[in-house]
């Protein structure tokens, strides 16, 4: 009712200035995203610094997301899970239409990414889909691999970020307990690619941005 009482010129004052400010701000954000490679450590912690030194040959989540962006089709539907890897990824994909991004939101259901992208593909079988999850969250719903590999199910792409830990919980631990943590590490020898193969799906391990971009492109093409 209130909107009906507004004139057709309501909000015209400085409208173009506001548009210009929004465009300038968004452009600055995009430039910042392209320059960020790693996360900074919280005061009093050295977690990220030690990880970069120990595993200098591995992609950071931000590098991985830039590689993913480069390989994603324009009309893709994506889903994300909870955790640091997917939270960082919220800043990267852009969409021209609605109903393209499935996310657990504030409900925080661990294991959401995999089953939600399966549902998206069943609902939109001709549209390429990509699900994302960290290795911790994926462990909650990975049993769905034994179902989705059946011949009557449409193919999907599922990306698993491997940092061998419950990263969000580890961060909470080191912040609250003087850089100490317990019960957050995952088995580095476990291969989700091999589990996928055992379930009848195709498993691919990538270690570089170039490999990741190519794998995304190929997997989406093979969904058709």
Language-model segment annotations:
Residues 1-5, 12, 66, 87-224:
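Thiamine diphosphate
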């Amino acid at each position: 009712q209130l909107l009906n009482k507004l004139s057709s010129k309501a909000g015209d004052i400085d409208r173009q200035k506001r548009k210009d400010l929004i465009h300038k701000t968004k452009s600055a954000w995009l430039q910042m995203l392209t320059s960020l490679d790693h996360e900074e450590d919280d005061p009093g912690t050295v977690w990220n610094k030690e990880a970069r030194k120990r595993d200098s040959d591995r992609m950071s989540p931000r590098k991985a997301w830039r590689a993913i962006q480069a390989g994603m089709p324009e009309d893709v539907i994506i889903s994300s899970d909870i955790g640091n890897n997917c939270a960082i990824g919220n800043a990267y994909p852009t969409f021209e239409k609605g109903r393209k991004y499935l996310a657990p939101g504030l409900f925080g259901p661990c294991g959401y990414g995999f089953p939600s992208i399966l549902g998206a593909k069943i609902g939109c079988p001709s549209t390429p889909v990509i699900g994302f999850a960290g290795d911790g969250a994926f462990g909650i719903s990975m049993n769905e691999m034994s179902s989705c590999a059946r011949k009557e199910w449409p193919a999907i792409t599922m990306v698993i970020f491997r940092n061998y830990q419950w990263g969000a919980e580890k961060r909470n631990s080191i912040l609250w307990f003087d850089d100490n943590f317990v019960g957050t590490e995952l088995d580095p020898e476990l291969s989700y690619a091999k589990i996928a193969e055992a379930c009848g799906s195709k498993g691919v391990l990538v270690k570089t941005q170039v490999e990741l971009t190519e794998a995304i492109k190929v997997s989406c093409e093979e969904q058709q």
